[in-house]
Amino acid sequence: MQILTWALAALAAIPAVTAAPVETVEASSMDELVERSPNVTLVARGTPSSTGTHNGFYYSHWTDNAGADVTYSMGGGGQFSYTWRNSGNFVGGKGWNPGNAGRVINYSGSYSPQGNSYLAVYGWTRNPLIEYYVVESFGSYNPSSGATNRGSFTSDGSTYDILVSTRYNQPSIDGTKTFQQFWSVRRNKRASGTVTFANHVNAWRNAGLNLGNQWNYQILAVEGYHSSGSASMTVR
């Protein structure tokens, strides 16, 4: 296995996008570093996809490695940060595994995209395989313009548009598959608030969109696609 070099910065340090000194550690994976150093801020630059647990939360970081200049860091509890520049496609954040239909998700932070990006509650189910997004904010591209509209509903102080799209032979939690995406897109963008996820599950069901009965991970996520930006978020 190829040995990767990762950087670890102390919790009290300024995030690694500054010139603050860091300790360099050799490890074969992000998971190994989390196990060896659970109480530090983890920073990963241009890293391969990885999942695991950190400070009591599940995390996921996926990238297509298409020239990605992406820095992903994790702090205490549910805190995580991204900075990216001229990235390929990436998505990641912190949350839970498995997810569930009744979770109330609280989050706060800052989100500053330049180009195509989403801030969303994000996850997967199986049987059937479904990728879902509750988009709380986005950059230059509104996903509601590229999917089939199934109506709208009100939750947590805003109207959300319901959408569905199909991805053909694309990456998934089960490898390359064809699957549907369910979307709720908030009209009033925000970077802090509460998502009552059951409201979205019910609205999707009423629109004929049924999630699978096997829950995989469920996270607050930042996604970027050939864009730049920064985000620092905490999920609770």
From Swiss-Prot:
Its EC number is 3.2.1.8. Pathway: Glycan degradation; xylan degradation. Glycans are attached at N39, N106. Residues 1-45 form the signal peptide. One of its GO terms (biological process) is xylan catabolic process. GO terms for molecular function: endo-1,4-beta-xylanase activity. It is found in: Secreted. Its main location: secreted. It catalyses: Endohydrolysis of (1->4)-beta-D-xylosidic linkages in xylans. InterPro entries: ConA-like_dom_sf, GH11/12, GH11_AS_1, GH11_dom, Glyco_hydro_11. Gene3D superfamilies: 2.60.120.180. Endo-1,4-beta-xylanase involved in the hydrolysis of xylan, a major structural heterogeneous polysaccharide found in plant biomass representing the second most abundant polysaccharide in the biosphere, after cellulose. This is Endo-1,4-beta-xylanase 3. The gene is XYL3.
